[in-house]
């Protein structure tokens, strides 16, 4: 099975280990990975900021880059959600509507792909300790991926997963929201960190680097002793 990896901007610039872990997990599950070097941003920051025409140019480039893929997989629920928004963005454009739908139909977040397409619930990972998981807004509410991460984490040997209090609450990142509405964003992430600390977990796990950078940055500034891990890194662990 051929998988075309959309690595995302944040993974490319800040969390390269997440990209490496994603590739290693998928290869271990029998996938052949392709990486189009022409890939750029999915267009979400510009689109959410109201720069629709600029965003469309990025989206068109991504459609051209990925439309011949068998499966498109990304370690980001948020960016996968943006791919699924492409048909809406181009619904009135006869040249791009069908091509946008074609790309959206074969785009998956990593855990969604493993559980729903590969039909795998145990990737053979092991990690000792306790963990809690932040469920990102775009991934759960817009993409509709709610169960797959928990299913995979429940089968990580040595790992005990504790429910995060107020798990439905946003961490305050929201892309450009954290820049435009900084005081509100700071209050939200403080509340999220309080919830994480309440669990007493060794690890905070998430499936979106934006959320993890936001929460992890706050945890570090506050001097808390919690390790922040992307779920791809957890699924690639053998400890």
From Swiss-Prot:
Biological processes, Gene Ontology terms: lactate metabolic process
GO cellular component, one term: cytosol
InterPro entries per record: Cys_rich_dom, LutA
Gene Ontology MF term list: oxidoreductase activity
Domain of life according to the entry: Bacteria
Pfam families linked: CCG
Family to which the UniProt record says this protein belongs: Belongs to the LutA/YkgE family.
Biological role: Is involved in L-lactate degradation and allows cells to grow with lactate as the sole carbon source.
Record-given protein name: Lactate utilization protein A
């Amino acid at each position: 099975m051929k998988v075309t990896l959309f690595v995302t901007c944040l993974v490319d610039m800040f969390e390269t280990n997440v990209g490496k872990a994603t590739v290693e997990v998928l290869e271990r599950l029998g996938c052949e990975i392709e990486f189009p070097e022409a890939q750029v941003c999915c267009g979400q920051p510009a689109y959410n900021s109201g720069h629709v025409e600029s965003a469309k140019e990025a989206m068109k480039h991504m459609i051209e880059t990925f439309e011949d893929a068998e499966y498109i997989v990304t370690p980001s629920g948020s960016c996968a959600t943006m791919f699924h928004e492409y048909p809406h963005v181009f619904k009135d454009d006869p040249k791009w509507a069908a091509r946008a739908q074609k790309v959206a139909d074969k785009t998956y977040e990593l855990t969604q792909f493993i559980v729903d397409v590969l039909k795998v619930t145990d990737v053979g990972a092991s990690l000792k300790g306790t963990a809690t998981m932040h469920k990102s807004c775009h991934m759960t509410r817009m993409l509709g991926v709610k169960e797959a991460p928990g299913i995979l984490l429940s089968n990580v040997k040595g790992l005990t997963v504790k429910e995060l209090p107020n798990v439905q609450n946003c961490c305050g990142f929201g892309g450009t929201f954290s820049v435009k509405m900084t005081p509100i964003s700071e209050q939200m992430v403080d509340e999220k960190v309080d919830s994480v600390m309440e669990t007493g977990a060794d690890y905070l796990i998430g499936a979106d680097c934006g959320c993890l950078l936001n929460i992890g940055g706050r945890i570090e500034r506050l001097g808390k002793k919690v390790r922040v891990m992307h779920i791809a890194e957890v699924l690639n662990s053998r400890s």
